[in-house]
Amino acid sequence: RGLLAIAIPITFGSAALQLMTMLETKIYMGQLLNLGYTQSAADTMRGVYGMCLTIFNMPCAFITPITISIIPAITSHLTLCGDDEAKATEESAVRITGLVAMPCAFGLALLAEPITALLGGYSGGNLAMATRLMTVLGFTIIFNALVLVSTAIMQAHGHAGRPVINMLIGGVVNLVAVYVLAGMPLINILGTPTGLLMGYVVISILNILSMRRLLPKPPAEALERDRLTRA
């Protein structure tokens, strides 16, 4: 029963996330067509954005193992050592995640043009579009990392359902933002990564508030002093 209590919310959250990704694509493609872009132009924009998303997901390959490894570590500390040891592990995880996420975020944001030119082979207008998209996605990595580590911390404490609810709320914010921003002629496809950024910001805030409310000793030092953004 305990295993199901953890597995069901996580499985439901993963399925809902995939559904929202499909809805996001449908929304921004529809908005681009409504703006007067041809199907070919809209498909090109989707392809460029998809390539930028692939680059955006690369830092997760380094951050995800951290979040996976801290769950049993925190659980064992809670069982054998108490809340203080668990809190120390959580704060270390936040700092280490920041050490990985911050260079990736600013590196991709500041070097968006040469990175997309090298990995995507773009030039001209497509390169300019990829640069703008990658810049926004670069800064999104910061909040994505915070979401990953805070979700793992709450799961280790047995609160697997709350991160899923927060993720669904952030997903709705993302979809609404994409619908509004992608429908603006001056923003168009740039509204898609901007909506993603807004969604992750909302999830990050909700996760932090949830940890302060649900955890006996949340990693307050790391979060209140914004260790993640200064690591």
PLM segments and residue spans:
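Interfacial segments at transmembrane-helix termini and the short loops linking adjacent helices
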Residues: 43, 91, 111-141
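Interhelical loop/hinge segments that connect adjacent transmembrane helices in multipass membrane
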Residues: 1-12, 81-84, 213-230
